Amino acid sequence: MAQNFTKLNPQFENIIFEHDDNQMILNFGPQHPSSHGQLRLILELEGEKIIKATPEIGYLHRGCEKLGENMTYNEYMPTTDRLDYTSSTSNNYAYAYAVETLLNLEIPRRAQVIRTILLELNRMISHIFFISVHALDVGAMSVFLYAFKTREYGLDLMEDYCGARLTHNAIRIGGVPLDLPPNWLEGLKKFLGEMRECKKLIQGLLDKNRIWRMRLENVGVVTQKMAQSWGMSGIMLRGTGIAYDIRKEEPYELYKELDFDVPVGNYGDSYDRYCLYMLEIDESVRIIEQLIPMYAKTDTPIMAQNPHYISAPKEDIMTQNYALMQHFVLVAQGMRPPVGEVYAPTESPKGELGFFIHSEGEPYPHRLKIRAPSFYHIGALSDILVGQYLADAVTVIGSTNAVFGEVDR
């Protein structure tokens, strides 16, 4: 089968079919339930085995980067919620971290504690969501029901803090919008206990389930060479045995002060990746347990103090003329960062999420580029799927934990 297609015409119009009873071309998605209307795979099959896979993306493209180049820095923050919408706080933070690096802001310690707690809470919510829907795709429905019940407790905590359950907008450039509500940390401790129990329950349902293991073991194997050549990150990379975690390699916020491990896999298959998600939940619980006592030892400020870029506290805006004028200018005209470029990587639940910003000293970025992990992992399907059975395609796609809000952007 020869494929000489151009970008101007649909791919199927440019495929020359040769008479071969053992080979066929199959459209997988975008209507297939596991592709959620956002992924099309053109699969070439020989019998039941995939001999070539071509991912086609773009069904959720909204021009997020170009939007960022036409908004002020603060206006763009809620848009980042819509990238990886299962872990929106991670997107908020990655963008804020890039802008803060450009501005050279010093973040108050209480804001750092709150941010790190929110990031790890968000990581657990994202991981438990992935495990539940991945199990549902493979056919284990009970896990979905138990996991979503526990996930609701985490979403309740996010709602108590910022008022939203999915698109949080819980981070600000320079800090956080709110201090923790009364008794919020007590609710967090209770949630950590619920998460531990849920994890044990899921492991009891899956770890010794021979059907689950047959569907995942030696399926979707990623080698170290493949992971490095495709620019994989996160659990897709660590599943191959490479212990690379940006929280350890280039620590931000309070991670350099925290004691936690970076779990790695041995075989790089789908089962290894599932195990790593479960182990990372333990590490997030461990991190939050270290952060809770830190909170009481911090001072009250939760926003950086820099009148050129950050508005004064609301009490000052309501009582002081200069603070009101400065706030008006920042809202109406936007902050003007210095001329320069910055790339700030973070470890999101999916992998390396980074924002590149090129500033010309204007109220909006001259160029904004988002380095989203799911984009690279979906591209790698053209290698991972080769040699797999068609029945295992859903397992492999699910094990990448890709979210198409950040693939298409």
Curated annotation (Swiss-Prot):
Annotated localization: Cell inner membrane
| Entry's EC annotation | 7.1.1.-
UniProt entry tagged with the keyword Cell inner membrane: yes
Q: Which SUPFAM superfamilies match?
A: HydB/Nqo4-like
Tell me the membrane topology, using the record's own terms: Peripheral membrane protein
What GO molecular function annotations does the UniProt record carry, in alphabetical order? NAD binding; NADH:ubiquinone reductase (non-electrogenic) activity; quinone binding
The principal localisation class reads membrane
Catalytic activity, reaction form: a quinone + NADH + 5 H(+)(in) = a quinol + NAD(+) + 4 H(+)(out)
Write down the superkingdom of origin.
Bacteria
Q: Which Pfam families match?
A: Complex1_49kDa
Q: Which UniProt keywords apply?
A: Cell inner membrane, Cell membrane, Membrane, NAD, Quinone, Translocase, Transport, Ubiquinone
Subunit text: NDH-1 is composed of 14 different subunits. Subunits NuoB, C, D, E, F, and G constitute the peripheral sector of the complex.
What is the annotated role of this protein in its UniProt record? Answer: NDH-1 shuttles electrons from NADH, via FMN and iron-sulfur (Fe-S) centers, to quinones in the respiratory chain. The immediate electron acceptor for the enzyme in this species is believed to be ubiquinone. Couples the redox reaction to proton translocation (for every two electrons transferred, four hydrogen ions are translocated across the cytoplasmic membrane), and thus conserves the redox energy in a proton gradient.
Q: What name appears for this protein in its UniProt entry?
A: NADH-quinone oxidoreductase subunit D
Q: To which species is this protein native?
A: Helicobacter pylori (strain ATCC 700392 / 26695)
